[in-house]
């Protein structure tokens, strides 16, 4: 069978390869210490589960509107107005099958052959592939630990051409945990507004997972002008431990949302109906479940960051958000694929190679795991690195 050129340009997920290898080792009875999780290790809060159960009992099991249940679209718009200072109405919201789906819909609606999409690296691994599937061109802008892996206004300006259509902003970041300060957000907004046809999509899936009093500012809240150029991608997976529920959303100007809704209507159609009622409960009830989770992540973050920075040859910034640390391994002399493969084979510790995120001199550790695993993993990591000297 001859497949399309479009598909041939898409790179298979490196993370799936590592995960598959770790699972195979476990099947063989080998105990693997995994730091690969891209999801919280907490169960979905009971009140969210109960809301979905009630929806099932009430017969909310049929097809729904492709754009989402009206009550959920209203709840999301209210949240964006009151918590993020983004003046959206329900009509500006599209409920999608997870945050990833919201971005995929967006790329299909906005990007076509010849369009460039600016993506700072390290990046979430699906961004460039989505752009390629939409037949656009990803323009990768490399950042370093010196700027906390954040793109500067000067770098953004230098990357913009007459073909630039979209800038992808992810704060807090996967894989680095970096969070742009309000001043940095305002500076990026000012650059975007220098160019008439440039838009920004702000991926805010980790917005609730913040540390040390860090403030999250949505770029669309800076002023009315940048609001008109902003698209918001978000979801319920990370903040509410709802990764398997597959409920995300896109917020933007009405023509865009209508176009994305049309695309969704001819692909997946509506998100699981009763899952949407769980999402409503997540928004409309007290947020203590999020606070409890973040408290646990805070404790784990301290242990893993201190532990890694005490190992000769390794270093990592202290993340301000999400639940990842991005570890610089350059001094070991190994690239990220070699480092990850050897660490897994010899010391049974699974991490994600930075090559998956556009940074081959780093690896990503997730601390969405228990404290015992973190401590054991750090001990094995130190033993492994000592063999490289």
From Swiss-Prot:
Alphabetized SUPFAM superfamilies for the sequence: PLP-dependent transferases (SSF53383)
Enumerate the residues binding L-aspartate: 38, 124, 174, 364
Which source organism? Synechocystis sp. (strain ATCC 27184 / PCC 6803 / Kazusa)
Primary location: cytoplasm
Gene for this chain: aspC
Indicate where the modification N6-(pyridoxal phosphate)lysine is found in the sequence. Answer: 238
EC no. given is 2.6.1.1
In alphabetical order, the GO MF annotations are: L-aspartate:2-oxoglutarate aminotransferase activity; pyridoxal phosphate binding; transaminase activity
Q: Please name the CDD domains in this protein's record.
A: AAT_like
Q: What are the GO BP annotations of this UniProt entry?
A: amino acid metabolic process; biosynthetic process
Q: Which cofactor does it need?
A: pyridoxal 5'-phosphate
* Superkingdom in the source lineage: Bacteria
Gene Ontology cellular component list:
cytoplasm
Give the protein family: Belongs to the class-I pyridoxal-phosphate-dependent aminotransferase family.
Which controlled-vocabulary keywords does the entry list?
Answer: Aminotransferase, Cytoplasm, Pyridoxal phosphate, Transferase
Reaction equations catalysed: L-aspartate + 2-oxoglutarate = oxaloacetate + L-glutamate
Does this entry carry the keyword Cytoplasm?
A: yes
Cross-referenced PANTHER family, in alphabetical order? ASPARTATE AMINOTRANSFERASE
Q: Please give the name of this protein.
A: Aspartate aminotransferase
PROSITE patterns to which the protein is assigned, alphabetical: AA_TRANSFER_CLASS_1 (PS00105)
Function per UniProt: Catalyzes the reversible conversion of aspartate and 2-oxoglutarate to glutamate and oxaloacetate. Has very weak prephenate aminotransferase activity.
